[in-house]
Amino acid sequence: MSMIRRSNVFDPFSLDLWDPFDGFPFGSGSGSLFPRANSDAAAFAGARIDWKETPEAHVFKADVPGLKKEEVKVEVEDGNVLQISGERIKEQEEKTDKWHRVERSSGKFLRRFRLPENTKPEQIKASMENGVLTVTVPKEEPKKPDVKSIQITG
């Protein structure tokens, strides 16, 4: 099995924008809202998601460490667009508190995926365990062709 990380450029099901400067050390040429220097916030905002297809379903797994299930939303738009979003809110600073270091990131993420036609969006299930969100989109049963026997005469 190959674990090649694919670009979304030619993926017809991905609705992510392509950044031609992604991966370069000097940052994004598209004026990203999350500069490379703040890689923790960028990692959270980008929410890495794996999408695999099994014979029965399409399975999405998203790393959302530190988020509660109430802070994550899974929705279907227009009947065939899976939307996964979440937000980690910055901890309230009390006037009496003295902060020595703030390293945990806060921010929002939003990812959309166009689902293939052979899915059942009305039966989507989602669960969270150990900081990993799993979304399962069942597939329709393959349609068996109607076979009609033709009687041979003569």
Curated annotation (Swiss-Prot):
Gene3D superfamilies noted in UniProt: 2.60.40.790
Domain sHSP: 40-154
Protein induction: By heat shock, arsenic, azetidine-2-carboxylate, cadmium, copper, ethanol and hydrogen peroxide.
Alphabetized GO MF terms: unfolded protein binding
Pfam families: HSP20
Entry's Gene Ontology BP terms: protein complex oligomerization; protein folding; response to arsenic-containing substance; response to cadmium ion; response to copper ion; response to ethanol; response to heat; response to hydrogen peroxide
Keywords annotated in UniProt: Cytoplasm, Stress response
Keyword flag Chaperone: no
GO cellular component, one term: cytoplasm
Intracellular or extracellular location(s): Cytoplasm
Coiled-coil parts of chain: none
Principal place of residence: cytoplasm
PANTHER family reported for this sequence: HEAT-SHOCK PROTEIN 20 FAMILY MEMBER
UniProt subunit comment: May form oligomeric structures.
Similarity field: Belongs to the small heat shock protein (HSP20) family.
UniProt name for this protein: 17.4 kDa class I heat shock protein
Natural source organism: Oryza sativa subsp. japonica
